[in-house]
Amino acid sequence: MAQAHLNPVIASHLVEIKAEENPDTRVYVFERGEHGEDVITYRDLHEKANRLARLLLEKGIKTGDTFGVFMRNYPEFVYSLVAGTTIGAIMVPIDPRSRGDRLKYLLTNSGAKAVIVSIECLEQLEEVLKDVPDLKFIAVAYQRDLGMPVSPKYHALNETLEKDTWETVDQMIMDVRQPMEIIYTSGTTGDPKGVAIRNNRTGLFNILNMIVWKYKKDDILYNGLSLTHGNAQAVTLFPALALGITAVFSPRFTKSRI
């Protein structure tokens, strides 16, 4: 039975509840083209996010700190989101096309103390590192289908996610008003503006589904937009998580895949 103190409005609490009730339910599928797909169950999501939460704590990231997530649509994006809500750290999703002044601005304006980056975005990050002195830690997610070499300068996130044993992290926040993310606007009329998204937004997404989307239990959702955008999270990521239906994600937007 799920622990009574868990609040399903908080994403990491919801994942823990679902992992106990329906551990093998396929909740997310990440397409890999000719390399197949990554299928993520509630158990996978809970365990790997918890491993990542432990890593963040060990690297000095604590409740209220911000950390960037800079990648295409990969499983590590969702692990990062759930890990952040586990410890009360605030995730800053960064569009994988960002570079130069825009990337530097997003990292400095948000006060990010760490970045979780996929390997194909690492070069863009390295170009601005000298101008982002407050970063404490960088973890790199290597994608098997890209075949890019491991950099010895940074922590390989894959090693953490694949651990057989780790010191589990208990849920560290209970206040649904605690910020979950800072999502930045496009900045078409000036610098991008950071919008704080509280944990109670998860509950609002569920209400939106009941009123607007009205997904059914046998529906399969598809998303080709970047998960760094609020629309992709509201329409596919969070509804699938709450309802136990499958959402399929493409790593990047291409018109030919729609």
PLM segments and residue spans:
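A short helix-loop-beta submotif of the ANL/AMP-binding
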Residues: 65, 72-92, 96-100, 108-114, ...
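Conserved AMP-binding A3 loop
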Residues: 39-43, 180-205
